[in-house]
Amino acid sequence: ISAKLLGRINGAIAKGAETHEVRTEEEFADFVHLLKAHNYFKPKRFIPDATFFRKVVESGCGKLLITTYNDTTIGCCAYAVSKGNAYLWYAAYLRKSYLRLYPAEVTVWNAIKTAYEEGCQHFCFLDVGLPYRANKLRDFILGYGGKPVSAFRWFRCRYKWLNRILTHVWSF
């Protein structure tokens, strides 16, 4: 992690942003609402129902984290744990509304720290964005010292007819 990124994270924490596990039903509702609202206009992302997240947490295979500022949820993420590795599954942030608090950076960094404290050896990002040259999400992930390991991209859309078209287009 770069010194600039760490400075942003420490500055946001000093301003009052804090990340913790989802504890109450109200926080769980805020988590689901932010996740669905963040991905509403992104047809390539499938967001499961709230019962899915509840069952993952109850089984002990995953964690739900939220970042709050003045009792407002500004970031959330869900990660799964398996065989000593943590996998960032879903994440959503209010980047534009809380620009100077860097909710994406704070949420992901605290998820990495939480996974490390639980004994996870690796932290993997499952969604690395679309396979285009200029990709802000991929650059964001690489800012944490990660390295890309995938050689191709598999598309999955929530609309079956669009899924068939994309599969046909990308098979050439």
Predicted regions and their residues:
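A conserved beta-strand-loop-helix scaffold within acyl/acetyltransferase catalytic domains
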Residues: 1-100
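Alpha-helical elements of Rossmann-like donor-binding domains used by nucleotide-donor carbohydrate transfer enzymes
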Residues: 30, 34, 51-52, 106-110, ...
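Conserved acetyl-CoA-binding loop-helix of GNAT-fold acetyltransferases
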Residues: 99-113
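Active-site/acyl-donor-binding loops of N-acyltransferases
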Residues: 120-172
